């Protein structure tokens, strides 16, 4: 038995951890950068974000933690950027992974190295070039919610309601395969673009 007064320790919950980890999946800003042999870590951040997103139950906490951590990390790196710049980095990263070498190929080779390396680090299922893009759709939607200051993260209950949505954007053909491969992932992609376009993002091209 220990003696003395008990200490109250505050432990970050899943929502806090998600907000924190999302800032690390932004290789051109506050995240783990390319070129330092950390490609596996970059993909692990993406996978962790997707896994935590399945359990997220407090979007406002994710939003608050993300905003704080993004600003702290930017300051630590001496970057004159705002959280919105970090979120755009994450969104572009998601699109790159969806594009499978068709969008930002120089970046994709780094992601693919991480995707190939992560197989021995997950306990169930497999991640490959195709289904990594499916995970990226949901992460992109979360980033879009944060970027556009959405009031909530709306989970998709009926993916069939989104299957007929189409976007005439340059580069869209490179990710249209998602519609037939994974209707749920495509629904989140649609929801992300529906948030982003009215605010002037990706109105002409996703490249």
Tell what function each PLM region has.
Residues 1-124, 133-147, 159-207:
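Catalytic cores of NTP-dependent nucleotidyl/adenyl transfer enzymes across multiple folds
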Residues 149-151:
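An amphipathic alpha-helical interaction surface
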């Amino acid at each position: 038995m220990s003696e003395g007064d008990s200490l109250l320790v505050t432990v970050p919950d899943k929502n806090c951890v998600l907000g924190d980890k999302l800032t690390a999946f932004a290789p051109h800003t506050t995240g783990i950068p390319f070129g330092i042999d950390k490609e596996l870590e970059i993909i692990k951040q993406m996978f962790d974000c997707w896994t935590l997103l399945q359990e997220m139950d407090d979007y406002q906490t994710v939003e608050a933690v993300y905003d704080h951590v993004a600003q702290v990390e930017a300051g630590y790196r001496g970057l004159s950027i705002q959280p919105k710049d970090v979120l755009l980095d994450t969104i572009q990263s998601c699109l790159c992974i969806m594009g499978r070498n068709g969008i930002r190929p120089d970046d994709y080779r780094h992601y693919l190295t991480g995707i190939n390396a992560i197989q021995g680090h997950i306990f169930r299922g497999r991640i490959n070039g195709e289904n990594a893009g499916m995970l990226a759709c949901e992460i992109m939607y979360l980033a879009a919610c944060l970027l556009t200051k959405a009031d909530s993260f709306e989970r998709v209950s009926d993916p069939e309601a989104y299957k007929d949505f189409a976007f005439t954007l340059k580069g869209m053909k490179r990710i249209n395969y998602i519609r037939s491969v994974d209707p749920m992932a495509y629904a989140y992609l649609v929801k992300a673009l529906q948030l982003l376009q009215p605010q002037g993002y990706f109105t002409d091209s996703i490249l």
